[in-house]
Amino acid sequence: MGKGPILACAESNVAVDNLLEGLVNIGVNAVRIGKPVKVRESLRNSTLDALIEQHPLQDEIEYIKQQNDDLRKDLNSLKGKEKGLAHRDIKNNFKDIRNLEKNVIAALLDSAEVICATTIGAGHHILGDRKFPIVLIDEATQASEPSALVPIIPVSY
């Protein structure tokens, strides 16, 4: 297709896990959005959280976080201009961390063939204003009308 990943949803976490399991078993690059504790243990490596932890930029993010921790520890001993510069560095580091995390998430979602989520989870801010060429709702008759609209209204084109 070339227009980005498909969004595959279901009302329950169990149903989403069943979708994800089937996709993973046939070799589809699928990413599961949602809290990892609600995802079947055998599928947790396909969660966005797990993929973020494994991403090569995660080392850089951790390094910057460690720099911030070190700077914060030293703040009490700093005075005047040095303290102001340290605060500026901490603020800039937080911006860098946020940008790196956004880039990692965007790269992971862009590279997926299918993004899996519950119908309500499809409204998660992490998907932002992302558009999908196809939105699939498995077992749609089991979903309430309001929850079935969440993946359809803001994200499809």
Region annotations inferred by a language model:
Residues 2-9, 14-135:
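Conserved P-loop NTPase motor core of helicases/translocases
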Residues 120-124, 145-148, 152-154:
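GG-anchored amphipathic helix commonly corresponding to the ABC/SMC/Rad50 NBD signature/C-loop
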Residues 116, 130-148, 157:
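SF2 helicase catalytic motif II
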Residues 2, 154-157:
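Short glycine-dipeptide loop
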